[in-house]
Amino acid sequence: MYKTPIVFLTYKRPEETKKILEIFLKIKPKKLYIFQDGQKLDFNKNEKNKHTQTTKIIRNFSKIKAKKFFFSKNICQKYIGFKILNKVFKHENKAIILEDDCIPEYGFFKFCDLMLKKYVSRKNIAHISGCNLYYGTSKKKIIKEDYLYSKYPHFMGWATWKDRWNKYYDPNIKDWPSKK
């Protein structure tokens, strides 16, 4: 059983959602939080259908225990992550975060878990990312290292700690005037 809590944010990708839920069945997370954002008012028929399918998939997912949250209104991309992680971090000290457009390899979870443990006392490290943007167009590695430090966050399959979340993440960037 996988011990680090996992947060999964879904929207309107039914096929990807199914694939990710299959991965969860294999890794068996001890704690799984699933959030479904609400529909936008201007959704076309196809988007409404995909959103409805995704919601049904989540509602029917019962093979492992999960806390499920469904938003009746669309929160919007800018705020949904902040809203859900603020909720999760009332109960957890760390978490792995996935959206429905990020289908991870199994090793991603072990990598995040190891890095969360390794860097727990390094307060200048805000998060661990499983995003791999460092390949060229030929799919050949641009960098030789297995992982790197970056001052730029990559929010495509990532993990963080409660204290870092509370310190570094602000959707309104209130301290921007002092950082310019």
Name each model-derived stretch.
Residues M1-L98, C102-K180:
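Peripheral/terminal regions associated with large enzymatic or DNA-binding modules
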